[in-house]
Amino acid sequence: MKGDVEMKKLLPIVAIATLVLSACAQTGSAQGGPAKVTVTMSEWSVKMTQTTLPAGQVTFALKNDGKLTHELAILKTDLPHNKIPARVEDATKVQEIGIIGEIEDVEAGLTKTDVFDLVPGNYVLICNEVSHYQAGMHLAFVVK
């Protein structure tokens, strides 16, 4: 009988502990470091593992599956990803309006990473190597 009373007292404590631990497990990756996204580029495409990212620090890994050198430029802009204006002095590249950062000159077969601090809003990823944007190397994503 005494064991039943002890068990009844223990059950709510175990239930609360389980809820607390599961809540920590769900948010642990966000607290454990930057979110991570892989961007894969090749002639003439850009793919992301996810196109909605959390605000804060995000690790971008640029994987070059192509045969040419590519770069990743992150632009914070409300312009559509296919409407970034060309540079006046060099129409083979686009203006890097609202640039947050970039990972430059990733040669074929290589991967480079960097961490960027993103605030909520609309973004565009581009490859701004000569004529790569015009060939379709751009993609929109959102930070919430």
Question: Each predicted region: which residue ranges?
Answer:
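C-terminal motif of bacterial Sec signal peptides marking the signal peptidase cleavage site
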Residues: 21-23
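Asparagine-centered strand-capping/turn motif at beta-strand->loop junctions
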Residues: 62-64
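Bacterial lipoprotein signal-peptidase II cleavage site
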Residues: 25-32
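Beta-strand signatures of extracellular beta-sandwich domains
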Residues: 71-75
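Extracellular/periplasmic metallocenter environments
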Residues: 45, 54, 67, 104-144
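N-terminal edge beta-strand
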Residues: 33-57
